């Protein structure tokens, strides 16, 4: 089971069981959505959909339960992605700079002041040491 299958299920229900509209919403071809749904049913070993001929017209009782869990799983997946993006944004706002003691004392102070004024959201971390220490 994967996120694509769960998204296909949730989207299908949102568009009232129209596979073509679900595919359009997901920017997929119809056969991909159909495949996701078949794979999901196969993995779970049960029917999730009420069918009228070949058409999907509703969810079975198990399908309703799976839908609730799928919605929660997708919400949690969104939270995980948000945490990752927040961390990435924090990393993008941090610059680590290595400098010798002389550079840190005499060269960098005016440069750091100008940089901090121009980019207040960026955190500068200055590490001082000998050239050999800074390589590590």
Swiss-Prot record:
- Which keywords are on file for this protein? Activator, DNA-binding, Transcription, Transcription regulation
Gene3D superfamilies xref list? Periplasmic binding protein-like II, Winged helix-like DNA-binding domain superfamily/Winged helix DNA-binding domain
* Family annotation (InterPro entries): LysR_subst-bd (IPR005119), Tscrpt_reg_HTH_LysR (IPR000847), WH-like_DNA-bd_sf (IPR036388), WH_DNA-bd_sf (IPR036390)
Keyword set includes DNA-binding = yes
Q: Which residue spans adopt a coiled-coil conformation according to this UniProt entry? A: none
Disulfide topology: none
Q: Which SUPFAM superfamilies does its entry note? A: Winged helix' DNA-binding domain
A Pfam entry, by short name: HTH_1
- In Swiss-Prot or TrEMBL terms, this protein is called HTH-type transcriptional regulator CysB
The organism encoding this protein is Thiocapsa roseopersicina
Q: What is the lineage of its organism?
A: Bacteria, Pseudomonadati, Pseudomonadota, Gammaproteobacteria, Chromatiales
Q: Which gene encodes it?
A: cysB
């Amino acid at each position: 089971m994967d996120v694509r299958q769960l998204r296909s299920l949730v989207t299908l229900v949102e568009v009232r069981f129209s596979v073509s509209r679900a595919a359009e919403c997901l920017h997929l071809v119809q056969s991909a959505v159909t495949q996701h749904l078949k794979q999901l049913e196969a993995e779970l070993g049960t029917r999730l959909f009420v069918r009228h001929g070949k058409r999907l017209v509703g969810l079975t009782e198990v399908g309703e339960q799976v839908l609730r869990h799928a919605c929660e799983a997708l919400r949690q997946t969104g939270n995980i992605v948000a945490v990752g993006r927040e961390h990435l944004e924090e990393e993008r706002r941090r610059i680590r700079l290595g400098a010798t003691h002389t550079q840190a004392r005499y060269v960098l102070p005016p440069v750091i002041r100008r940089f901090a004024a121009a980019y207040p959201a960026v955190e500068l971390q200055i590490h001082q040491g000998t050239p050999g220490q800074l390589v590590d």
